[in-house]
Amino acid sequence: MSLTTPYPADLLLVARKVVWYEKPEETLADLMTFLAHLMVYGSSADVSVAEHYVPAEEFRRALQNAPAGVFDREAWEKWHERFGMPVPLLPRRRFQIGRAHV
């Protein structure tokens, strides 16, 4: 799923808050990144705004495809429990050094 432009003003405000280092339009163009940051940095009011425009299945998909380094343990567990999903280990970055993955 992707959100269509023009983006709603209330959603732009949430995007600006949770991904402060990008323009909100750029943030909303990458829905999975937006949702991951929302689930960590957003307030319950921010989440309510997003839920008005984004179905719950997209939140689940964002959890299943979460980038490494965004979620903290508390948010990771909270959102998995909210959706009745088993709580896996947090995503980790992997680096290839020669032939070995570290």
Regions of interest found by a model, annotated:
Residues 14-35:
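N-terminal acidic leader/helix
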